[in-house]
């Protein structure tokens, strides 16, 4: 390498070999010197190539060393990170001062420092935070999203609630940030972390939320037709004790705790219950001098209240009455309405596949006349099989008042028709002209004609022939199965026919012919309904009580002459409907 460097140094920078002193003196080296110069130039080129290769190799080596150094640094950082103690999560309680806060970690309450990078004003109770090995808060996160379910028993001041956890264990917990923004009520389901003592989230459950509908009904007594005596009886039972409580106390009378509305389906039991709540709200507002009426109508869907787990249905009933007492504590009337009451509170010991009623019935009895009195709470039950309800519920002191909702007679049917067939409806011009040109007279004539068509005991109105256990037979007419719901349906059918005539024929308005056709269609549609394995049970549901029915024959199909009337015999009683 040194010999190469010496040879390179002896070459002129311009690429020519410098001549030695003897060469200049004797006139040059000639051809031999030229060859020597060429050889030196070749050596120089080879040296430059080798130098470039060595330089490139040196660059690659330097790059490899840098990469190795970076990997070593990264590995060292990873080793240091793995060697650090674990960071802990805690629950924020409250800010205590400049840069400090109280937290709960693993059940321990501590006062720790907070990193300057975190704004204490943005932290809310119950929020998750991260602490380092020195137990300083270094990061903030969202709220806990899991926990045990607990039910609110009582709302306490200062952001606390009393909840019922598993096995009815009572516990006082704090409310986390999201729950502080909205009101809570008894019975709400919350997610609770028992370690930190916080409730984080309200969980909508399909328990009482779906079974209970809190509302102020918009149904008035004037909206109900054909039930004047029943409405008067229920107003005497409900409104008098509420409006004249001092007179009742003076005479030593207690208001009734409950009312049973019984009768065939579709005759207005639910409407009456809603009208009671509405009327009570108005009367209560008048007593207080308030302009806006307020009441609560808790509509209990009986069959959906049943639960396959032991004790759940009873707990729901307790929760319903607890909510009713809560709403009524301020003097606001509360109506608890049990629809289809026989599905929940049937006679104990009558169950076919279970004896769930043996515990549900006593639970209701304890709520009605237990230690806690029901103030401003009215229990109304509705049923079309009152014979299946446990007698202990129906005795005086519980459901004191029993009101039968009968099927409408001709006069009542006219009143019900007047609720749905009004002069403000579009009426056909010919019908109006026939009745003196006034809409009210036209409506009255339509109602009279329709009621006469429905209630006349003619052959075309014959519906069923029933045979009793004693051998007697009786012909039942369509009027014997009429109801307010059927009347509304007839009017709706007539209105649809009027709309179709307007679209197809261009003739606008309801006609009496539409009502007549609607009656025929409604009767025809109902001829297949008495189809049950037990005619006597079907007759009881439909409101026909008395001697046991063993045979039913429909008469409408047989009158047309195309096919015989359909017969229904009594078969072995399975206890269930098809």
Curated annotation (Swiss-Prot):
Residues that hold ATP according to the record: 266-271
Domain-level remarks: Consists of three main regions, an N-terminal coiled-coil domain that binds to protein Pup and functions as a docking station, an interdomain involved in ARC hexamerization, and a C-terminal ATPase domain of the AAA type.
GO molecular function: ATP binding; ATP hydrolysis activity
Family matches, as SMART domains: AAA
Coiled-coil blocks: 35-84
GO CC terms, sorted: proteasome complex
Protein name according to UniProt: Proteasome-associated ATPase
Protein family (similarity comment): Belongs to the AAA ATPase family.
């Amino acid at each position: 390498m040194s010999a190469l460097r010496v040879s390179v140094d002896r070459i002129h920078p311009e690429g020519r070999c410098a001549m030695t002193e003897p060469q200049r003196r004797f006139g040059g080296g000639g051809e031999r010197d030229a060859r020597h110069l060429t050889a030196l130039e070749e050596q120089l080129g080879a040296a430059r190539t080798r130098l470039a290769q060595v330089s490139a190799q040196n660059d690659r080596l330097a790059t490899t060393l840098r990469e190795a150094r970076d990997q070593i640094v990264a590995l060292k950082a990873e080793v240091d990170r793995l060697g650090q103690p674990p960071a802990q999560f805690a629950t924020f309680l409250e800010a205590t001062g400049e840069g400090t806060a109280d937290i709960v970690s693993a059940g321990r309450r501590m006062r720790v420092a907070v990193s300057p990078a975190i704004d204490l004003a943005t932290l809310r109770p119950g929020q998750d935070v991260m602490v380092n090995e020195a137990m300083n808060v270094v990061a903030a996160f969202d709220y806990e999203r899991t926990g045990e379910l607990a039910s609110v028993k009582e709302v306490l001041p200062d952001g606390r609630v009393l909840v019922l956890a598993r096995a009815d264990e009572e516990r006082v917990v704090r409310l986390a940030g999201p729950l502080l923004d909205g009101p809570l009520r008894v019975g709400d389901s919350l997610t609770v972390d028992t370690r930190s003592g916080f409730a984080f989230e309200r969980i909508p459950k399909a328990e009482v939320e779906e079974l209970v509908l809190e509302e102020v009904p918009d149904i008035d007594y004037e909206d109900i037709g054909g039930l004047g005596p029943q409405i008067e009886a229920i107003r005497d039972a409900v409104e008098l004790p509420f409006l004249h409580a001092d007179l009742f106390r003076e005479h030593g009378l207690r208001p009734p705790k409950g009312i049973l509305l019984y009768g065939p389906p579709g005759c207005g039991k639910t409407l009456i219950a809603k009208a009671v709540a509405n009327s009570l709200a108005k009367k209560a507002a008048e007593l207080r001098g308030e302009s806006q009426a307020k009441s609560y109508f808790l509509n209990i869907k009986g069959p959906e209240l049943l639960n396959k787990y032991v004790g759940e249905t009873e707990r729901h009933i307790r929760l319903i009455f607890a909510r009713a007492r809560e709403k009524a504590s301020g003097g606001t009337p509360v109506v608890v309405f049990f629809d289809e009451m026989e599905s929940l509170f049937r006679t104990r010991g009558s169950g076919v596949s279970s004896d769930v009623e043996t515990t549900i019935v006593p639970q209701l009895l304890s709520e009605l006349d237990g230690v806690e009195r029901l103030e401003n709470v009215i229990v109304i039950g509705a049923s079309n099989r009152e014979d299946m309800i446990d007698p202990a519920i129906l005795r005086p002191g519980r459901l004191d008042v029993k009101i039968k909702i009968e099927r409408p007679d001709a006069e009542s049917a006219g009143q019900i028709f007047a609720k749905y067939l009004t002069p403000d409806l579009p009426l056909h011009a010919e019908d109006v002209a026939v009745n003196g040109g006034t809409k009210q007279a036209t409506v009255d004539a339509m109602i009279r004609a329709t009621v006469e068509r429905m209630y006349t005991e003619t052959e075309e109105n014959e519906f069923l022939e029933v045979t009793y256990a004693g051998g007697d037979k009786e012909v039942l007419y369509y009027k014997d199965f009429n109801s307010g719901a059927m009347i509304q349906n007839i009017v709706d059918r007539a209105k649809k026919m009027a709309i179709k005539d307007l679209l197809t024929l261009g003739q606008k308005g309801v006609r009496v012919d539409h009502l007549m056709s609607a009656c025929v269609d409604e009767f025809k549609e109902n001829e297949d309904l008495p189809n049950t394995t037990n005619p006597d049970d079907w007759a009881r549901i439909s409101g026909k009580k008395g001697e046991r029915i063993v045979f039913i024959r429909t008469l409408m199909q047989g009158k047309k002459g195309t096919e015989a009337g359909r017969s229904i015999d009594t078969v072995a009683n399975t206890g269930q409907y098809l």
